[in-house]
């Protein structure tokens, strides 16, 4: 676990309680619970928190070899309000093109997907072969 990461860093008292895992296919997922500290509209998750979690999940998926890839762009689509409570996030690579890795993911609750995201992640120059 990272010490200083804004999403999962244990030194960040406001980091959402998200711990990601990766399956054999490279899909990153997390089951977590967001409470009042992450509230935007009454009873619902702040949209910026959803974007933060998805940026992190997509970035984890984009870096299966342990080499970090940095967000080049991210597009977030809010399908409906995300209620506070138990949630699930998933992300996976959709394709690669040179130094660019394309990923897609979502957050869902017990009624289905609430937020979707797509991102392009770039391998930094210092890590290119």
Give the label of every model feature segment:
Residues 1-31:
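Non-catalytic linker/capping segments at the edges of enzyme domains
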Residues 24-27, 37, 44-68:
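Active-site helix/loop of acyl-thioester processing domains in fatty-acid/polyketide metabolism
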Residues 25-29, 73, 86-88, 102, ...:
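Intrinsic-disorder/low-complexity, polar/charged segments enriched in Ser/Thr/Lys/Arg/Asp/Glu/Gln
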Residues 31-33, 75-77, 90-92, 106, ...:
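Residue-level recognition of well-ordered beta-strand positions that form the cores
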Residues 33-39:
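Conserved short histidine dyad/triad with adjacent acidic residue
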Residues 40-43, 126-128:
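A short, polar/proline- and glycine-enriched secondary-structure boundary/capping micro-motif
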Residues 57-88, 93-94:
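Hydrophobic beta-strand-centered segment that forms part of the acyl-chain substrate-binding groove
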Residues 82-84, 94-129:
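HotDog/MaoC-like acyl-thioester-processing domains
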């Amino acid at each position: 676990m990272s010490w200083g990461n804004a999403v999962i860093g244990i030194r960040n008292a406001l980091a959402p309680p998200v711990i990601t895992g990766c399956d054999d296919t490279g899909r990153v997922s997390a089951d977590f619970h967001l409470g009042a500290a992450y509230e935007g509209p009454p009873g619902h998750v702040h949209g910026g928190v959803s974007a933060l979690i998805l940026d992190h999940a997509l970035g984890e998926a984009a870096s299966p070899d342990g080499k970090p890839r940095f967000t080049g762009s991210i597009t977030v689509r809010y399908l409906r309000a995300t209620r506070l409570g138990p949630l699930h996030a998933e992300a996976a690579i959709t394709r690669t093109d040179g130094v660019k890795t394309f990923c897609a993911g979502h957050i869902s609750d017990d009624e289905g997907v609430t937020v979707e995201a797509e991102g392009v992640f770039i391998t930094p120059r210092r890590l290119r072969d």
